Amino acid sequence: MDAYERITRNAAEVVTEEEIEAMADDPDGKRAYVGYEPSGVLHIGHMLTANKLIDLQEAGFEVTVLLADVHAYLNDKGSFEEIRHTAERMRDQFIAYGLDESNTQFVLGSDFQLDDDYTLDLHSLELETTLARAERAMAEITSGDSVKVSQAVYPLMQALDIPYLGVDLAVGGMEQRKVHMLARDVLPSIDREPPTSLHTPLIADLGTGRGKMSSSEGVTISMEDSREDIESKVNDAYCPRTADPEPTDDGQSRENPVLQVFEYHVFPRFDTVVVERPEEYGGDLEYDSYDALEAELESGELHPADAKGALAEYLNRLIAPGREQLAE
């Protein structure tokens, strides 16, 4: 796998293709970042972008993880003391999950977001941005019917973080797309380059296959989950014999979250996936690619129950180091 393939593997979108290709031609010394609100224990959404950071490190990038304590405060996630304590725990979990500690810089937002220059640049961006545009950028991230003034400033800070961190590539889930497009539009107004961005897919709710997996509603997987928790959640997961399920009766689109987690979490981290089965049911199945596993689920060779058993096992292997770190 060459640098371009590793950088773009499992990406839902890159902006722009030409900019990513140029980085792939000479990735050494390039820097990518993801920002995370330190608002809780790592869950499968954090792990999806962390997988991409691991890919980027293997491609030659240096990585910055922004533990966005000021953002979390503006988003009403607790006091600074509480948020910073959570940030320290999250840092340790990211390392336990597999980020290369020697090649990862962890930065608190408050290390630079309270400086005079940053504040003045932020005010300049406020002058360039309508409230409606800021609300649209924030709508995919926050919940609730109304946006507070602090939350409207939030996406402008995300845009400004990119040049202040000195990064070449902004990484986030598809819910960050509007923020990154806002950044491309407004940063040139303060003589900063429009950022290159890479967006990871959104995984559907584990129980229903609808919407997106969320730590605030529905069913998700986190580093607090025991092996038994993981097995229970995965066993109850929605898993039809196809990667492209029919929509619900009321027209909502659905995905197969079991296959999504195999594709975006398991296969990027394991060269081979073994599905254990008793000899009386044909013995073990072994896959060296996601496509092969998907094809055998659709053909009937792989039963959904056996796929779920394997998924729970590999998820537990990924999560166990972080779970052990949390227990210390």
From Swiss-Prot:
Binding annotation for ATP: 215
Family listed: Belongs to the class-I aminoacyl-tRNA synthetase family. TyrS type 3 subfamily.
UniProt region (Disordered), positions on chain: 193-227
GO biological process, one term: tyrosyl-tRNA aminoacylation
EC number: 6.1.1.1
GO CC annotation terms, alphabetical: cytoplasm
Endpoints of the signal sequence: none
EC category: ligase
Protein name: Tyrosine--tRNA ligase
